[in-house]
Structure formats: structure tokens, C-alpha cells
Amino acid sequence: MKKLSILLLVALPLMAAAAHKYYFSVTQADYDAQEHSLKMVTRVFYDDLEKAFQERYDASIKVDATYDQDKLDAYIQRYFDQKLIISVNGKPQQLNYIGHKDEVDYVVCFIEVTGIQDLRSIAIENTLLMDVFPEQKNVIHLNAKGKKKSFLLTEGNNKAMLNFSE
């Protein structure tokens, strides 16, 4: 798993430099026991997200600094609410979209789930961009209660699950 993490950290910027034929996102999800929250950071290529928004919502949407950032945040929040489903202890959770920042060739999105009490399991269903790119792969790095696990999600296997026994 450590090698996969290192590979992805190196590969993402390199792949971004060229016109990419690979479709993937990377999400880091960390449980904060003191704040009773799951903090997530998702990285998605600009052009892939833009294509999804243009096909799904409005052909004029641009995922860049020239587009109205409040509108862009609203589209990102709406899309993530539909495509990123978090369940804690078997119960679906409300996502709190915090915002995004622009990086070279990709968008970094910040999301949080709050009010997590007595954590026994976390399930993450991630279908980001799979409706536009069937070959899309979504990597999840999950860190909670001393456990670290990475998942590679695809169209046929789009759910990650981590259980904690007392």
C-alpha cells in the first residue's frame, strides 16, 4: 500500500503535464477523533470535471479561475452530493462541502462529515466521473482509528469499507 501511495503522489503531477488518457481521482479521508469528523481532500483533473459538469448541468461551465467561483462551488457541491456517498455505522451522512482550490491541471476539493460518534465502520461509495468515463478509477486513502487502508474503486467495484472492532 505504501508503494501505491508513493506511486500515485509521483504519477499525478507527471500525468497532468501531458494530455492524459488515464482517468482517476485521489481522495484522502482522515478521521479526527477529537473533532468527531471525517476530513476529506479529493483531487480531480480540471478537464474531466468540466466535461462531467457540461454534460450533466450546463455546456457553458468552465472549471477554471475565469468562471464565477460561487457558481462553480455550487456545481462541485451538487455533484459530490450525488457521486460521493459516505456512511458511518451503516447510516448515510451529510457532506459538508468546504470549498476548492486550483492546482496545476487539477482541482482540490475539501469536504467534511461531522458529528461522528462511536465510530464502528466507514463506507465510501465514490462514483465521481464514472458516468462520463467508464474507465475512471477513484483511489481512496482512508485513515481512521489507527488503521490505514487504500482502495482502488472502479465502475464495477465503487465502494470502500473499513470496519473497526472493539
Model-based region annotation:
Residues 4-13:
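Sec-dependent N-terminal signal peptides
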Residues 20-166:
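N-terminal soluble domains immediately following signal/targeting peptides that reside
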Residues 14-19:
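Sec/Tat signal peptide C-region and signal peptidase I cleavage site
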